[in-house]
Amino acid sequence: SFTSYQQAREVIDTTGGEYYAEMLANKGITYLGSFHNGFRQLTNSKHAVTTPEDLKGLKIRVPGSAVYMGVFKALGASPTAMSWSEVFTAIQQGTIDGQENGCSVTKSAKMDEIQDYMTIWNYSYENDLFVANTKVWENLEDNTKELLQQCATESCEWGRDRLEAEEDELIKGFQEEGMQVDILTEDQLQAFKEAVAGVTAELKQSYGEEACAAFGIN
């Protein structure tokens, strides 16, 4: 994953965006831009997580995705696929120890009220795409396409800026509420990257070298 929103912007606005455009064009879709959905962070009720060893044995709710399951298994945790609607109660009852999600979702779901520890590690970046049906797009006047492309670009930038500012405020709020928030350093993150190297290798095989190279996955 990217290490920062700045890196995400730089990659997606160059090689990543080019890859999206080519891939979508083959499906009759025109790519107009990309905006953040956010980095996924970790919260739990047990203890601070700053090393892979800290995750060992922790029961963490993840979406039902082989990638997420693989990452947490590689880190020694016990990933649990569970409906999001069940997570709050499961944490209260001790069925699971924590969850991973974006800061805004963590706040809206009131996880900060039942979780004492948060790890900012940017382990997974998610974004949404601004697209158009190519058949419809090609029937538009050139000046209309230019205007819509400009609006799409401006909207994506606005969305990115807003999410980044909102997350900074949310993290400050979590800390002020008494939540321990550990923002991992590059050295700390390196240990996690090494622990999931096998999963990264599998992703390269699954998605192909071209896709991985486009998004800076080496």
Kindly label every feature range from the protein language model.
Residues 1-7, 16, 24-218:
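N-terminal secretory/targeting leader peptides
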